[in-house]
């Protein structure tokens, strides 16, 4: 399974939290444009670490969890993988990430 940040989404990691937003809101819109815009979300420090593993290019969940296991020491690999997949899938469902 692969994940990536959508092309029209911006993610920033700050000290203590993360910020993800849909940049398409900042462009000109036609009057008949009925698309749903995602808005913005703040995530915790651990969520920001997870999202910072992604970019605009697809990345394997196993590669991501491999790196995360070096940061979240003491967490079982399968537990970390399950938590990461659940976390990423929330953002897929909300439209911030792509999955394939």
Region spans (language model):
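Acidic, low-complexity/disordered tracts enriched in E/D and polar residues
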Residues: 1-53, 93, 100
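Long, charge-rich, low-complexity alpha-helical segments
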Residues: 36-100
């Amino acid at each position: 399974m692969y994940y990536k940040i959508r092309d029209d989404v911006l993610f920033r990691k700050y000290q203590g939290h993360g910020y993800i937003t849909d940049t398409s809101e900042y462009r000109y819109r036609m009057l008949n444009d009925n698309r749903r815009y995602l808005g913005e979300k703040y995530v915790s420090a651990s969520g920001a670490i997870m999202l910072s593993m992604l970019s605009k290019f697809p990345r394997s969940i196993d590669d991501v969890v491999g790196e995360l296991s070096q940061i979240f020491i003491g967490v079982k690999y399968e537990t970390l993988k399950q938590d990461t997949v659940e976390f990423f899938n929330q953002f897929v469902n909300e439209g911030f990430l792509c999955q394939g």
